[in-house]
């Protein structure tokens, strides 16, 4: 709040130094809405949206390399329709659809578990994609990157979100 008058007997102290960065004003508003929508506490959503350790500044964005065209280019068509459901074989690792999402720009890729998220993040990095693995690489996400993680990764900062992929948490593996 701006120009707040303190209660009598309370003296405000000037803010001398800002120690780090945190969630954007938009994420703060979203946390309030989510708390109202699911009758939860705002603090739970703010924890999900905040870095685990202090972050002095967002990481500098790496220059974007072209994302290679994978063998499953059929996934590119799914993103032409806005919202789509794509069915794949149970043993599919999700890399094809993830690469298709990354060809659109920075993507949010949600997986069922952290092991699968790590595996997918490594595969995307090998393909030349700038990846932030949630929740550990909050500063990288804030600087602009594809975010890979479990459902809580949806609270990571994404300044240039271009596509979202949810890899079914009810997968057959």
What is the predicted function of each stretch?
Residues 1-173:
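Accessory, non-ATPase domains that flank or precede helicase/AAA+ motor cores in DNA-metabolism machines
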